[in-house]
């Protein structure tokens, strides 16, 4: 199946087989978080096989990574994980600031700037806190490759036609 638009899928991915099934259904890229910690070997194999289609999804709270739908807090910080992921071939990273997600309080610009400065070759996707078009413009300046607009779109703060 081929969609007339790009489809990135995320949530609940726990195995290499699930990723392969999603790709066979026409999904362009997958966001993977928990698998990074539950089965690093499988995640690294996916990176090797699909380097442009795998997005590492790291959710952070108080500078610590959470996973399993934010149910488990790790002792890891982003900088504990990213160098190894990059050495395995990671090209795309989505970072969600848990404290900002769904709050419409503005994105964590300092966090994204720091990440882009340390990891300039990663395509960075910002998630959490976006309120309006001004926030998207600010994130373009980081620069972020993409932005998850979630609640801002659902609440009507963003008009997709206006963004295109």
Set out the residue ranges of the language-model regions:
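Short, hinge-like loop/turn segments at secondary-structure boundaries
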Residues: 48-52, 72-75, 111-113, 142-143, ...
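A cross-family glycoside hydrolase active-site/sugar-binding cleft signature
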Residues: 8-12, 31-33, 55-59, 94-96, ...
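Catalytic cores of alpha/beta
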Residues: 1-29, 110-146, 163
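Leloir-type glycosyltransferase catalytic cores
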Residues: 103-105
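C-terminal helical cap(s) of enzyme catalytic domains, especially alpha/beta-barrels
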Residues: 41-49, 136-164
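Conserved anion-binding
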Residues: 20, 27-101
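Active-site environment of divalent metal-dependent phosphoester hydrolases
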Residues: 101, 131-134, 155
């Amino acid at each position: 199946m081929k969609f007339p638009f790009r489809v990135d899928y995320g949530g609940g991915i726990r195995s290499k087989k699930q990723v392969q099934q999603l790709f066979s259904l026409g999904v362009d890229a997958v966001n993977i978080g928990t698998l990074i910690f539950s089965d690093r070997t499988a995640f690294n194999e996916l990176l090797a096989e699909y380097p442009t289609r795998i997005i590492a999804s790291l959710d952070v709270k108080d500078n610590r990574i959470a996973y399993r739908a934010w149910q488990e807090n790790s002792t890891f910080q982003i900088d504990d994980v990213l160098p190894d992921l990059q050495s395995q071939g990671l090209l795309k990273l989505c970072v969600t600031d848990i404290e900002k997600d769904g709050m419409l309080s503005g994105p964590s610009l300092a966090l994204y700037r720091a990440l882009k400065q340390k990891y300039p070759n990663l395509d960075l996707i910002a998630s959490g806190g976006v309120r309006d078009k001004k926030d998207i413009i600010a994130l373009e300046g980081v620069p972020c490759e993409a932005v998850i607009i979630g609640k801002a779109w659902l609440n009507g703060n963003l008009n997709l036609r206006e963004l295109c």
